[in-house]
């Protein structure tokens, strides 16, 4: 028989991260077709984000949110974006699991003549410097990575010292709105 899994110290969020809710403001002109371009489904954080995305869509009463699981590269982000934008009921908003895929998605939208944010809102996940260097600048979820690193270091020192390690929650990411997000166009106005 297998022994029960060992509990390891962890630093993490007490609740799943926001996703679709970050690009959907309540109201009559809210996004209803939201997609997510995520990392490999087998990775724990990708699975947590996918679950949070699905739960948020359900809470918002939205059907048909689409996931495209890819690697984290720009090439795969571009391929996923292109496949989403070629569908007849293309999304009005896409949430990306990292900034590189979001930058690639922005490039694909430009190549395809899809105006960001007039026709499509894009949201990046990491809020790296890349988000401020694009045109339009990318809205993103901001994380306090320095505080997260400090918490991880404190946990490591506690483990090394043989001290009891308590769970350490970290702050939920916050939305940094920039120029890549806007309410969707009214029905029938989209080209």
List the predicted regions and their residue ranges:
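Bacterial carbohydrate/catabolite-sensing allosteric modules
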Residues: 1-191
């Amino acid at each position: 028989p297998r022994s029960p899994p060992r509990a390891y110290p962890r630093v993490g969020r007490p609740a799943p991260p926001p996703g679709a809710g970050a690009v959907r403001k309540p109201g009559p002109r809210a996004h209803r077709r939201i997609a997510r371009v995520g990392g490999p489904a087998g990775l724990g954080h990708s699975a947590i984000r996918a679950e949070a995305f699905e739960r948020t869509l359900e809470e918002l009463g939205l059907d048909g949110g689409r996931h495209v699981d890819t690697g984290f590269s720009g090439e795969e982000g571009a391929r996923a974006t292109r496949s989403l934008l070629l569908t007849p009921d293309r999304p009005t908003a896409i949430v990306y699991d990292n900034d590189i895929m979001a930058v690639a998605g922005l490039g694909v939208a430009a190549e395809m003549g899809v105006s960001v944010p007039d026709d499509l809102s894009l949201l990046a996940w990491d809020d790296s410097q890349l988000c401020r260097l694009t045109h339009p600048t990318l809205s993103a979820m901001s994380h306090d990575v320095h505080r997260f690193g400090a918490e991880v270091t404190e946990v490591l020192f506690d483990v090394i010292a043989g001290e009891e390690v308590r769970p350490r929650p970290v702050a939920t990411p916050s939305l940094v709105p920039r120029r890549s997000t806007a309410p969707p166009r009214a029905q029938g106005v989209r080209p």
